[in-house]
Structure formats: structure tokens, C-alpha cells
């Protein structure tokens, strides 16, 4: 999601607004001061844009700071590669039927993390050709679908595939981030400011 420490990208083409008005008002970067302004600067440096989701988070700078810090820590010091992180995000977004998060992570997954369009689509289904990524997605799918309940058999399979307890904790952290951003984007009713991807795309044969 927004504020990942990656090279700036061209401003994505924006789809037609979906909502007549947001439920939570985004903070205008031009009017931001203090810590909020600094966080916006860091976000723009990373992404080349300041997404609507970050602007909504900025209503509470502590939340925005915490989100940025967690995402930055996982991205720079975590054990999961960028492509695996984006696969998890795509899976969680699809399970949540989150068009906002799907739009963000399809763009980031294919433009930043190096996923092909086919790999991004497979990730939404919880599938991957790489055995390691497949094991990660299998566990992430269990976490998001069963609300954190993971069977002994599932954990045994994860460990057999080479995942440590540390990996499991890190995967759950990424799932939680995806759930948080989905709920915030949905509650705020913000417009999608990334190239639009709908959770129904593959049902219509367009994914």
C-alpha cells in the first residue's frame, strides 16, 4: 500500500470517481504542516504521488506514522521479497473484494515488484508457480479466509515448505496491513486513484 520505500513512479492514470463524496475527508497536502507535511513528503518521495488513502490516514498523524513505520520496517528489514509481499497483498485484496487495494497492488506488483500480469492474477487466487511463494500464499489464504484460525496441519505444511515461525508472524503482519487498508478505504469511501482493477475482473474474463 502507500508509503512503501521504493523509487518514485509516474503518476498513475486515474479512473472516473466512484463516490459522490468521501465519508472521511482527505487532508490537503498543500495545507499540511509539521509531522503531517513531513509524512506527505516521504510518501511522495517513495511513490511520486500522495495517494488518497494516505491523505485520509493523515487525519490522524499517529496512525499515518505508525502505518508508514510498519510498512517501511517490513519492506526494508523483513525476510519477504517485494514480489512475495505484493502477492500477499493481492490475495488479501481479492479475498476482501477490495477494488482500491487491488488497483494499488496490481500497479505496484507489476510496475515495481516485477510480477507479470499472469502472476498477479494467479496471486489473487492464492496461486504461484514458485514453491516458496505458493507456500506463503497458502498460509496467508488460511489466515485471511479463516480470520486467523490456522490448523496444525496447515502450520505443519508451512514448516515443511521451509517457513519458520518468524516467517509466519511476518506473513500475518502483511495480511493485517491489507485488512486495515481495505477497511479504511471502504469506510472512507475514497475514490480509486490508481489504474482501476475490479475484484470481479476475472469473472468477466478480463483479468
What are these regions (language model features)?
Residues 1-207:
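Hydrophobic alpha-helical segments
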Amino acid at each position: 500500500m502507500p508509503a512503501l520505500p521504493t523509487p518514485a513512479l509516474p503518476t498513475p492514470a486515474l479512473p472516473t470517481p466512484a463516490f459522490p463524496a468521501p465519508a472521511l475527508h482527505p487532508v490537503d497536502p498543500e495545507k499540511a504542516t509539521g509531522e503531517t507535511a513531513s509524512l506527505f513528503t516521504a510518501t511522495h518521495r517513495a511513490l511520486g504521488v500522495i495517494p488518497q488513502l494516505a491523505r485520509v490516514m493523515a487525519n490522524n498523524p499517529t496512525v499515518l506514522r505508525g502505518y508508514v513505520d510498519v510498512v517501511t520496517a517490513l519492506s526494508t528489514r523483513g525476510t519477504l521479497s517485494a514480489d512475495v509481499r505484493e502477492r500477499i497483498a493481492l490475495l488479501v485484496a481479492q479475498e476482501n473484494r477490495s477494488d482500491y487495494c487491488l488497483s494499488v497492488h496490481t500497479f505496484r506488483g507489476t510496475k515495481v515488484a516485477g510480477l507479470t500480469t499472469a502472476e498477479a492474477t494467479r496471486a489473487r487466487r492464492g496461486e504461484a508457480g514458485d514453491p516458496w511463494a505458493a507456500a506463503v500464499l497458502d498460509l496467508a489464504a488460511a489466515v485471511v479466509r479463516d480470520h486467523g484460525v490456522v490448523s496444525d496441519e496447515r502450520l505443519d505444511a508451512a514448516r515443511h515448505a521451509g517457513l519458520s515461525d518468524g516467517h509466519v508472524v511476518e506473513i500475518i503482519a502483511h495480511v493485517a496491513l491489507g485488512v486495515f487498508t481495505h477497511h479504511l478505504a471502504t469506510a472512507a469511501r475514497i475514490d480509486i486513484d490508481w489504474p482501476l482493477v475490479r475484484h470481479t475482473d476475472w469473472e468477466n474474463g478480463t483479468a
